[in-house]
Amino acid sequence: MGPLVEATEFSKEQALTDAAENLLKPHFSTDATLSLLEVMESLLATVEQDLSSSVQKALHPPMRALVSADLLRNPDSDVRVSVVSCLTEIMRITAPEAPYNDEQMKDIFQVTIEAFEKLADASSRSYRKAEVILETVAKVRSSLVMLDLECDDLVLEMFQRFLKIIRPDHPQLVLVSMETIMITVIDESEEVPMDLLEILLTTVKKDSQDVSPAALTLVEKVLSSCTCKLQPCIMEALKSSGTSLDMYSPVVSSICQSEFATTQAHNDVKPKDNEADEKISEGQVVPSDSLEDKLNLGLSRKGTRSKRSARGGTRRANGDEKVITANEGLSESTDAETASGSTRKRGWKPKSLMNPEEGYSFKTSSSKKVQEKELGDSSLGKVAAKKVPLPSKVGQTNQSVVISLSSSGRARTGSRKRSRTKMEETDHDVSSVATQPAKKQTVKKTNPAKEDLTKSNVKKHEDGIKTGKSSKKEKADNGLAKTSAKKPLAETMMVKPSGKKLVHSDAKKKNSEGASMDTPIPQSSKSKKKDSRATTPATKKSEQAPKSHPKMKRIAGEEVESNTNELGEELVGKRVNVWWPLDKKFYEGVIKSYCRVKKMHQVTYSDGDVEELNLKKERFKIIEDKSSASEDKEDDLLESTPLSAFIQREKSKKRKIVSKNVEPSSSPEVRSSMQTMKKKDSVTDSIKQTKRTKGALKAVSNEPESTTGKNLKSLKKLNGEPDKTRGRTGKKQKVTQAMHRKIEKDCDEQEDLETKDEEDSLKLGKESDAEPDRMEDHQELPENHNVETKTDGEEQEAAKEPTAESKTNGEEPNAEPETDGKEHKSLKEPNAEPKSDGEEQEAAKEPNAELKTDGENQEAAKELTAERKTDEEEHKVADEVEQKSQKETNVEPEAEGEEQKSVEEPNAEPKTKVEEKESAKEQTADTKLIEKEDMSKTKGEEIDKETYSSIPETGKVGNEAEEDDQRVIKELEEESDKAEVSTTVLEVDP
């Protein structure tokens, strides 16, 4: 069987070559030429699309011979018809690629349209050939190439010839082929030109005299099939001409009235009414049985049909595809004409990508303009791999594949764009075709009867060409996004559930065999949103509520629509949510304007997309702007709320912050910090009580007998009696315990005054680290208080140590704590004397000199030694103090921060030059005594004895003053015994 096939192929190749050579020879007889053309036509009819390299090579000479001037421009019409018959076979073989360049294709189409004239006379010699030509043009959809080549005049001429030559006695195949060609051209045009529309309307006009019934029937079928496309054009034409619907055939009235019926159906949301409207608008179609009889949609032996590549209105270069040319040198070219992606300027051209099974691509041989001067096997070698066989004429009865009436619909349902959307990128090199807003208002709707016919005959093929519709994606670039969010992935309405790839038309899927179009090209977000609104036939069947509205094909929801009476200028400026059926979601936009003539609203979506919609036919929601109302309410609330309420609210928030940072935690650090705070508060209260005590003792300190108190103080320091110390401590603890009850109240007062922020809480954490040091300080504080709260000893100490006291008085105005950070100093120094750390320790150690360590006793001894050396100077100072104390008795305290200063001022001696020198001497003496550590105990005992003896000399006071001092000392001793227990508890308290 193998050798026989090879022999057959070889003989076919040889026959094609011989026939081409014979045609190129000059012939003096028309009959001889016709005979050679008959042989050529029969040979070409046996060639399938799946070409071998040898057949491709053998096909080249016939292609060159058929476009020669002697044959294509032969004076005999029968010869020209025979040539066209051969050329249509070549177009079938090379589909979806155009076999010649643009100029040659235009010449071929011109001759083809002339050949249709032979259909007017059934008795003519070329009538049968004309029928075959018409059938082939319809099935391979070569009329789309005419649109791509901008052959507008040829299209108009073809329509006129069809209406002129059609006869009632024509076979149904002729009528259906004419109808198919006309519907294909209208549906695939971006905008139906007025000249073409005028031809159709003139035919269906009632007063037309020269229109045959067959032509009227043909036009009515075309109008009914293209209702969605022609409806707005017809309405506009009638308005511009001012003619009435009564002047035209009832089909025109039904087309125009279907718009109102559709509007009512959408507004009422009644699916049954929508179905009825669909029947009205699309019911006038050719009976399906006649189509099945005359159009056999059987598949070829390979189960595939001829296909065409997607072009989208612009020609592109494809280096992998070789197109056979027959221009004397048989040129092979790439797309040098529109390499820059320039688009055609005409407004009438194929609307979209076409389905490859249904005929030619928009790509023609003119896109390949590089002349081929060498013929090689490669000139035809790559064509066969890309062609899907169409049936040959050998034994062709019901095997011929004729283009279905739904082919244009299938092309639209695939990757072709909707009529009211802009052409977007759908392939590597395809440029977008700019369309006017007026061109974006309708979408093709496939006739249901034809759709059923198509699916019944090519069911297997349909299973593989479900085309996907991608859903709208919101913009994620340019930082807008305002959305950040976030973006829905592209949905597809395919049989396969995958929703992440954009599936183009079957043209691209089949062209991917050996070509570079096997990878889906992602579309822009705008094209995805717009494509998602196009409804495929499969989608229509899946919808529960089919609608006849040709423009939107929206799914009617159950929600309440807006009042149709208010869908005018009242909506301008309002924000709306518009329903997109394939995305199954609403998209937000703003109504920018309203056209009274078109009754269309211009909606600008949040992603920048602009669309003109008839909102009476749309499903949408008006978005109420509640933000302004809420803002006004908030402003009113702010204005009506008093300032005190906000302050109180802020305080409560800060309290909560402090409680969150302290209370929930049970760690030792937090507990210790809380104890530190409580102790700090108790010490603060003790400070206040000390001030009150000093105020009560002010009268005593103002007496001239203050020197007696000074002597008593020195005596207490020398003796260092523990009992007296404990008595003073017990008295102080008594006051402290009384003030503990007010801790919580004082804490609240401190919060209100200080309004601590988060930094204070952090400081509190840091203070907890230094808790051990503070604990020691707090344990020593009661003794410190005792030193400071001695009845009048503190005030009289200035007479004994004038330099130190004067220095203290000079610094006292700044003694009050200024910041929280300095608060711990004020706690250590109840009288707020700004002493250094060393001075604080010395002040705390002085009352308990004998109870401290040996080193502390040495320091106390050294200090007393320094006092002894300046004993004579102290006598002088004491006299001066007595004189000035009487003058300063009536001095009132100036401020709370200076209260301590006013208490000590009566006994204080202002610093003079002599005192400054004495202070310097005293400091020098102290420094020297510190270095003498070996004299600690011995000198201390001697100093004690000498001090006892010196008391009578310096303690010359009245009897009344001595009695008062003794009474105070006695009271302190009694209280010391009672407070001994509480003192022990305070020292042990953690």
From Swiss-Prot:
Extent of motif Nuclear localization signal 5: 715-722
Phenotype when the gene is knocked out: Weak impact on meiosis such as formation of some chromosome bridges at late anaphase I and telophase I in forming pollen, but severe effects on development, fertility, somatic homologous recombination (HR) and DNA repair, especially in plants lacking PDS5A, PDS5B, PDS5C, PDS5D and PDS5E.
Annotated Low complexity bias: 662-673
Acidic residues: bias regions: 746-760
Superkingdom: Eukaryota
Keyword terms of this UniProt record: Cell cycle, Cell division, DNA damage, DNA repair, Mitosis, Nucleus, Repeat
Pfam families named among the record's database cross-references: PDS5 (PF20168)
InterPro entries linked to this entry: ARM-type_fold, Pds5
HEAT repeats: 31-57, 58-96, 153-190, 191-228, 232-269
Name assigned to this protein: Sister chromatid cohesion protein PDS5 homolog E
Organism of origin: Arabidopsis thaliana (Mouse-ear cress)
